[in-house]
Amino acid sequence: MDGDLRGDTVHIGGDARQRFHDARGYGYPLGGNDIAVSLVEAAHLLFRGDLDSVDGMGFRAFLTDREAGFAARFLVYVDLRDRGFYLVPDRDPWWRDPGDGDFVVFPRGNTRRDGVVKHRVRVVDERTTLPVDGLSESVLAVVDEESEITYLDIAPETPTGETTLDRPTDVPGVLLDDRVLVWEPPQRLHNAGFYGQPLGGRAADHDALQLSLVEAAYLIDAGVLRLTDATIDDVRARGRLGEGEHFDCRLAVYRALRDAGAVPKTGFKFGADFRVYSAVSSVDDLGHSELLVRVITDTHVFSPGDLSLDVRLAHGVRKRMVFAATDDTDDTIRWLSVSRLTP
């Protein structure tokens, strides 16, 4: 059986509708028994030996005659078919509600007629740049230089928490280098709110709480903390001295997390900006943090390798990786959760 190349589709006659479309989900009907299939579907049919040729080209010639990026899409298509999924190109007329990805994947045992979507898949290679403003809810299929495929699930995130605290007010503190010290602090500030770290160990002769600059700036804004030797502008300036504008971005994200009832703490040892606990009632009964948050700007550009590295690190410590993209006013934060996926 042969196919005819018509632009970006291949037309197949004979018993193609019953054999390929009705039974196995390829292409769309043209009328009678004829169907049109996409180029990647045609390549798969050639690869399997179901088609003999397209315009006289066998599989090898057809594959090498395609545009840049086709090989990666073909590899992902083959992989998902081999995993037992039906899938179609993410465009009309294959799918009634086309998006900006490459494939619409249906649950095992389902076809497009069932109308249930399992994944929207976008295919990239490992050298593709990925602007954060171009990432949407989808599965990113990254094809590396050895043709292995990594699937990353990208989804919007809404951080929430259940931490409540009767916060004190007008607590005095002093600015010391890149932290703020609170002498004789209200115990609930750390014990129930998990703000700061106590100075010294159990044998310390002085009761003091160390606050990071981000924590201090947030607590000053909230009316909890009052500096006796500096202002909030001094705290911000000290933060910018070491981080530049990233300090303001981190502060905006910290504020959003705290205001949502979550508890962000430094994520330095995990290579992130914050580790986040959804609920803290006492530091003596502290569970594991659930999220790692990396703060970026809304103009950030990922490489697939860096994205995969962050996700693998979070997975290795049993956390989810979340990216918080701030705009130039720090008023709007876009949250994206990225995790590894096995289709």
From Swiss-Prot:
UniProt KW keywords: Lyase, tRNA processing
Enzyme class, spelled out: lyase
Name of the encoding gene: endA
GO biological process: tRNA processing; tRNA splicing, via endonucleolytic cleavage and ligation
Pfam families named in the record: tRNA_int_endo, tRNA_int_endo_N
Listed name of the protein: tRNA-splicing endonuclease
Record HAMAP family: EndA_long
Function according to Swiss-Prot or TrEMBL: Endonuclease that removes tRNA introns. Cleaves pre-tRNA at the 5'- and 3'-splice sites to release the intron. The products are an intron and two tRNA half-molecules bearing 2',3' cyclic phosphate and 5'-OH termini. Recognizes a pseudosymmetric substrate in which 2 bulged loops of 3 bases are separated by a stem of 4 bp.
